[in-house]
């Protein structure tokens, strides 16, 4: 995992996924 520019997009995607479905958010936390 590259933590440079992609980190910003990852956070944005995480927020969008969190809004759409909490289930996906749990998987996101595991990835982080």
From Swiss-Prot:
Pathway: Cofactor biosynthesis; pyrroloquinoline quinone biosynthesis. There is a cross-link at residues 16-20 (Pyrroloquinoline quinone (Glu-Tyr)). InterPro entries: PQQ_synth_PqqA. Pfam families: PqqA. Keywords: PQQ biosynthesis. The keyword Nucleus does not apply. GO terms for biological process: pyrroloquinoline quinone biosynthetic process. It comes from the Bacteria. Belongs to the PqqA family. Required for coenzyme pyrroloquinoline quinone (PQQ) biosynthesis. PQQ is probably formed by cross-linking a specific glutamate to a specific tyrosine residue and excising these residues from the peptide. This is Coenzyme PQQ synthesis protein A. It comes from Dinoroseobacter shibae (strain DSM 16493 / NCIMB 14021 / DFL 12). The gene is pqqA.
């Amino acid at each position: 995992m590259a933590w440079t520019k992609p980190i910003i997009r990852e956070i944005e995607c995480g927020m969008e996924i969190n809004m759409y479905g909490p289930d996906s958010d749990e998987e996101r936390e595991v990835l982080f």
